[in-house]
Regions:
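Conserved catalytic or regulatory cores that recognize and/or transform ribose-phosphate-containing ligands
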Residues: 1-156
């Protein structure tokens, strides 16, 4: 199952944390696309914004699930956009199984009660997926969706 791993990528810590999580996903038979591990083509002369959009949008469109890192006082704006794109694509594509968000940041409290995270973005996640508090929970959910995808393929 192809998974798009959305999350903030602006600090060394953020990139290392996402890469570390991706290693665990791969060790569990999952196939995450991690944007910073997939560099843009050096001969592409378009603007950085256009290259980033095209590369990441294509990866989102090809993915069967999304994992979104939503730690911090606010959901990263790029991550929120990617969540919205995947949610919209899910409405017409039965091979897309859902969005699982990883929120293990105790500073922002519980997922549903008084949390300052954007309600619209959280609503997108909750309508088609789940918010997990640990990477282990994330892996369980992604494996369940992977099993569902395999059953769907066998039924065709």
């Amino acid at each position: 199952m192809k998974i798009y791993f959305a999350g903030p990528l602006f600090t060394v810590y953020e990139r290392e944390y996402i890469s570390k999580c991706a290693v665990s996903l791969r060790e569990n038979g999952l196939h995450p696309f991690v944007p910073h591990e997939n560099p843009m083509k050096p001969d592409d002369t378009r603007s950085l914004a256009q290259r980033c959009l095209d590369k990441d949008f294509n990866a989102i469109a090809e993915s069967n699930a999304m994992l979104a890192l939503i730690n911090g006082p606010e959901i990263d704006d790029g991550t929120a956009c990617e969540i919205g794109i995947f949610y919209a694509l899910m409405q017409k594509d039965s091979t897309k199984k859902g969005i699982v968000a990883l929120h293990d940041d105790w500073r922002t409290g519980g997922v549903s009660e008084g949390k300052p995270l954007n309600a619209f973005v959280v609503g997108c996640i909750e309508k088609v997926g789940v918010i997990c508090n640990s990477l282990e929970e994330v892996i369980q959910q992604l494996n369940a969706w992977s099993d569902d995808l395999q059953k769907d393929r066998e039924a065709r």
